[in-house]
Amino acid sequence: QSLPLVYTGQEFGYDHSFAFFDRDPLPACEPNETTEFYRRLIALRHDAPALASGERGGSFVEIRNNAEDCLLTFVRETPENRVVALLNVSPYEVHADFDTGIYAGGYADALTGERVQLCSHVDERMPGWSFRILTRPM
């Protein structure tokens, strides 16, 4: 039920390592593609009840897949909404092959808003570090 942290400067694409307990100054940065990406992820986290922390959020349900060392596929769901995440957490292209079962159906891409269909069987190639986050009201 935990969430990833955004470390200082990540939202600007800054890749310098800061001392953990020291407050390093962050150089001036202009908003960019990375900033917009983080804004959308943070907005999704606030707008999707399924992604709330603790008991308020949806339970984590793993969707079993053929490449569990590289693919993270899961659902979080509340009575208000459902979020389905398909993530290739490796630098390698991976052949994703798995059934989505009861989670198949129409969704919105959480970052673009594009309407998409999640088929009952996924059989596709996912480039390294690629992902899809899908959401829909219940």
Regions picked out by a protein language model, each given a short descriptive name:
Residues 1-138:
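Carbohydrate-interacting/catalytic domains
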